[in-house]
């Protein structure tokens, strides 16, 4: 955690109700209502997202589903903070983003280790290869995920503490001055950054730059959802495109992480075959995502933001 905790941090503790049901938690709202005051609405949405993340992790839960859902809620909260950035100010914004980064970065290895087992299953099924042939490789990945859960469950109290600090601060966010034009500018800025980055990605094979663009596209998707009620057709055409981009680029990322793990593990005939297979899948998948991205980001920023009724 960088820097000192600001003196304006809200001090009210968060007390979650006891978890009496194991039913899936309801997905919290992620859109501003028409006529709703922007500042008040964003604070309400941030509260819903943080409380959802805390509820998922309640009882030091490190099961795959809750970990994934908590990470998504953290990312959505980050998008809300960036959208509210003009009113929050740099110091407060960076403090909040740092807290979310600390929480999210501790959950990421848990999610990644679980997904690698699933990714291997998907790859083998798509290739029509017998799962039994790769049993030792799959068992090794499953053991990594199991050990990660055992080790990282101790991280959950720290993660919860970071999220509670964000939750405690929300009532103090000075968002009354936030205007519709501020949101337009922030979304336009996010779109412009993504547009510039995808142009560079299309002319080279920089893996990290592609990963950066993937996160920008996902961030734009959340901003579209936040303002969906102010777009024609509630932004459904745009959301459909950006969701497909996010899903395919996320798959590319999962395959890349799987490949890194297999390259660093023990080698045998089966693992070498799996490595070769995944290696051939990544470049065309990445190229497909880039082509979709270039099509989506074709309009200039001014033209893209024009239909937004804010």
Residue ranges: model-predicted function:
Residues 8-310:
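Cationic, histidine-enriched alpha-helical/coil surfaces that engage anionic ligands
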């Amino acid at each position: 955690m960088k820097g000192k905790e600001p003196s304006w941090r809200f001090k009210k503790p968060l007390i979650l109700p006891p978890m009496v049901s194991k039913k899936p938690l309801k997905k919290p709202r992620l859109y501003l209502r028409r006529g709703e005051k922007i500042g008040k609405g964003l604070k309400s949405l941030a509260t819903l997202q943080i409380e959802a993340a805390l509820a998922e992790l309640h009882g030091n839960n490190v099961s795959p589903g809750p970990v994934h859902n908590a990470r998504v809620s953290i990312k959505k909260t980050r998008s809300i903070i960036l959208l509210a950035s003009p009113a929050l100010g740099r110091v407060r914004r960076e403090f909040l983003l740092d807290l979310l980064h600390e929480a999210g970065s501790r959950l990421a290895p848990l999610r990644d280790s679980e997904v690698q087992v699933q990714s291997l299953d998907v790859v083998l099924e798509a290739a029509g290869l017998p799962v039994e042939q790769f049993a030792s490789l799959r068992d090794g990945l499953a053991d990594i995920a199991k050990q990660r859960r055992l080790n990282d469950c101790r991280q959950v109290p720290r993660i919860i503490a970071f999220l509670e600090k964000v939750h405690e601060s929300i009532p103090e966010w000075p968002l009354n001055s936030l205007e519709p034009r501020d949101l337009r500018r922030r979304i336009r800025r996010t779109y412009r950054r993504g547009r510039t980055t995808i142009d560079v990605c299309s002319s080279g094979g920089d893996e990290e730059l592609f990963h950066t663009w993937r996160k920008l596209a996902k961030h734009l998707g959340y901003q579209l959802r936040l303002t969906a009620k102010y777009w024609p057709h509630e932004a459904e055409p745009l959301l459909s495109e950006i969701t497909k981009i996010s899903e395919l680029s996320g798959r590319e990322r999962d395959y890349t992480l799987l490949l890194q793990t297999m390259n660093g593990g023990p080698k045998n005939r089966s693992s070498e075959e799996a490595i070769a297979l995944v290696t051939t899948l990544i470049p065309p998948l990445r190229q497909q995502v880039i082509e979709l991205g270039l099509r989506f980001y074709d309009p200039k920023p001014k033209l893209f933001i024009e239909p937004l009724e804010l």
